[in-house]
Every structure is written in C-alpha cells, then in structure tokens.
UniProtKB/Swiss-Prot annotation:
It comes from Psychromonas ingrahamii (strain DSM 17664 / CCUG 51855 / 37). Its EC number is 2.7.7.72, 3.1.3.-, 3.1.4.-. This is Multifunctional CCA protein. Comprises two domains: an N-terminal domain containing the nucleotidyltransferase activity and a C-terminal HD domain associated with both phosphodiesterase and phosphatase activities. It catalyses: a tRNA precursor + 2 CTP + ATP = a tRNA with a 3' CCA end + 3 diphosphate; a tRNA with a 3' CCA end + 2 CTP + ATP = a tRNA with a 3' CCACCA end + 3 diphosphate. ATP binds at residues 8, 11, 91, 137, 140. A single active site specifically recognizes both ATP and CTP and is responsible for their addition.
Length: 409
C-alpha cells in the first residue's frame, strides 16, 4: 500500500498559497484494509475514507469510464491494479494532477509543473469533455488564479466550447451549478468566471438572464461603458472591494436583470427596470436553488437601487419609507449591505471607479439618526397599536428632517 498527497494541496503548495484541505490517494489497497486501520468510509459511488485523527480524505486509486450523461455518468473501477498515473489521468487539469510522496518527491506525469510555471490552465486528455462540470471548474480556477496571471490554454477553451454545444451542460444538477458559482463569487475576481462562461458559450445555457444583458445599451452620460452586460461584470468586480459576503456579491451580479426586459424602442432608457428584474431574480433563484438570504438581498437591491442613487434628493418621509420597506430597523446589517451594493453599482462604470458615492453614507447616517428615536415617550402618551407605529414614523421623519437641515447638500 502506498499513499500520496494529490490535487489542490500539492498545487497550492507549489503556488505558495495556504493549503485548506489535504486529499490523499491510496495505491494497492482495499476498503477492508483501510477500515481495519480505523478509517471511516463515506460516499456511495467510489471508495473514499476519512482519517480517524486528521479528518483528511483518502480515496482508493480509481479509473472512470463514461457510461451516461452528465457529471455523475461514470463507472468507477478501484481495483488493486490501478496505478497512480492512471488515477491522476482522470483529473481535470494538469496543475491538479501532481502527486507528492511522503518523502516529498513530486510525481508529475502530465507536466503540471510546467503549466504552473507558464501559468496555464490545461486539460489532461480529451476525456475532459466527458464531464460537463469541468466547464464551471475551469472558469472558477480562471477566476481564482487570475491575480497570479493564469490563462486557459486555447485548446482547453475549445473543448469547453464543444462541451457547451453538446447539450451535456443540461445534465448538471442545480446544486452543482450553484456550488461552483458560489465558490467563484467568493474569489477575488468573480467577474472572470462569468466572462469565461460567456467565452465558451456556457453563459446563455446556465445564466440566460445575465447573457441577455450583453448588447443592451444604457445612456452614455451615466454609463460610458454603454453595454449593460459589461457594466454588470464591472459591478461584480467592484463588489470584491466592499464585502466578502456571498449574498452581497450575488445581489451585485443580478441588480440590473430587468434592463433585458426593456422594449428596444425605449433604449437606452430603462425606467422601472428594478421592479421588472424581480421575477427574473426569483426565476434564477428557483432554478438553481439559491439560498433565501441571497434572493432576499438581491430583490431589495434590484427594486430600490435607482431610488438610493437619488438619496441626496429624497425628502425625509421618502427616506423613512425606504427604511420601512427594507425592514432596516430589524435588519440594519442587510440595509447597510444594500447601500453598499449601490456603491458597487456606481463605481462599476468606466471612469467612475475612484469617484465618491455620497448617497450611501448620507442615507446610512439618516438611518442612524432615525434609529435613536425612542418609542417609550410615545407609549407613555397613551397611543396604542397602529397609532404607536404611525407616531413613531412621524417622530423619525422629524428627526431626519433636522438631520437634512444640518447636512444639506
């Protein structure tokens, strides 16, 4: 029995990145042998075991043969005769197919070290085309390693295009699509993930709502980049500078979906696009089983971002109504995230990247002032039920009116 460290742990060590998970491959062993050593078996499709002390994953060396459609359409063989080279060959990219022995020796049959040096994301063999999930994985790696200068090999991008046009992407489960997308949104360059999906023809299949934004113009005065799809990716890029929250970055991604529904004869104006986008956001979230936290923030941002952009002009009662509609009193953190999404929206425009966006701070300070209003004096005056709520709103409006007088722009 031989054990090798494989995959992402070896790759990240070589890239001098922090190693999160360590996965091992076990050569010439049986499930019974590992169970006797105290390992716990998990997974039904192929033999994976959890180390009793470290919790690391140990998988028996295996080969895979395509027998059906989609990411799970494989038949696995984990016999004693499967070699390390055969096990590494089934992996997606050369940089993920390097193994390390307990003595530190690197085993690199598919030239992953060379591709690390040249910053290339390259498939190992044409078997790459058998697994549609690899389109999303490569796009995610392109986003994750973009800052390091990694690029997708042209021939690998060609295979990704072939996969996109083959119909195989239709067999991916919603959960896997969202898992890869969520992980991509957590990288430093999530916009690259969506750009790669577009470059290989996968975006219209997986995210038709986002694909539909490309080619939709906005007024040049406010959007020098003009194209709404380009603007969307710029906003996603800006989102990274403001928050690492998944819900926040997703809301930035989908804030303008409604612009795709504007009749062409009304272009480049998009009046009411925020509310128009709500159904598209809900459809996308239903289809990919996206968490409610992401959906809720995304819908609020879509519906209210154009109003927030006019925050400096809003009367006190409009500001309090905005806070009421967004449940800011009970969910101040979400309200703050919503305002910051509008910062990303403003800065996600050509030439506006470094420009101030005072509206968010202005509204947030108004909210903090309104929050200080004490309900107890209202209750002591004898108001009850809905009257308390109405009087509290009036008191908050008065406090914001005073704030506006002191901070008039």
């Amino acid at each position: 029995m031989q054990i090798f460290l494989v995959g992402g742990a070896v790759r990240d060590q070589l890239l001098q990145l922090k190693v999160k998970d360590r996965d091992y491959v076990v050569i010439a062993a049986t499930p019974d042998k590992l169970l006797k050593l105290g390992f716990q078996q998990v997974g039904k499709d192929f033999p994976v075991f959890i180390h009793p002390q470290t919790g690391d994953e140990y998988a028996l060396a295996r080969t895979e043969r395509k027998k059906g459609s989609g990411h799970n359409g494989f038949e696995c063989y984990a016999g004693l005769d499967v070699t390390l080279t055969e096990d590494l060959k089934r992996r997606d990219l050369t940089i993920n197919a390097i193994a390390q022995s307990p003595q530190g020796e690197l085993i690199d049959p598919y030239h992953g070290l060379q591709d690390i040096q040249t910053k290339t994301l390259r498939h190992i063999s044409t078997a790459f085309s058998e697994d549609p999930l690899r389109v999303l994985r490569v796009a995610r790696f392109a986003a994750r390693f973009y800052d390091l200068g990694f690029k997708i090999a042209p021939e690998t991008l060609d295979l990704m295009r072939s996969l996109s046009s083959s119909g195989e992407l239709n067999h991916l489960t919603a959960e896997r699509v969202w898992q890869e997308t969520a992980n991509a949104l957590k990288t430093n360059n999530p916009q690259i993930y969506f750009q790669v999906l577009r470059d290989c023809g996968a975006l219209p299949l997986l995210f038709p709502e986002i694909e539909a934004l490309f080619g939709v113009p906005a007024p040049k005065k406010w959007h020098p980049e003009i194209d709404t799809g380009i603007h969307t990716l710029m906003v996603v890029e800006q989102s990274v500078k403001l928050s690492d929250s998944l819900a926040f970055r997703f809301a930035c991604l989908v804030h303008d979906l409604g612009k795709a529904l504007t009749p062409k004869e009304l272009w480049p104006s998009h009046k009411g696009h925020g509310k128009l986008g709500l159904q598209l956001i809900n459809n996308l979230c239903e289809r990919l089983k996206i968490p409610n936290e992401c959906r809720e923030l995304a819908c609020l941002v879509s519906e209210h971002h154009t109003l927030i952009h006019k925050g400096l002009e809003l009367e006190a009662d409009s500001l309090i109504t905005l806070m009421d509609q967004n449940d800011a009193w009970r969910k101040p953190e979400r309200f703050s995230q919503m305002l910051q999404c509008c910062v990303a929206d403003s800065k996600g425009r050509t030439g506006f990247e470094e420009k101030d966006y005072p509206s968010a701070d202005y509204i947030w300070r108004a909210f903090q002032v309104a929050q200080l209003v004490d309900v107890q004096p209202i209750i002591k005056q004898g108001y009850q039920g809905a009257e308390i709520k109405a009087q509290l709103k009036h008191a908050r409006i008065r406090s914001v009116e005073q704030y506006k007088q002191k901070h008039s722009v």
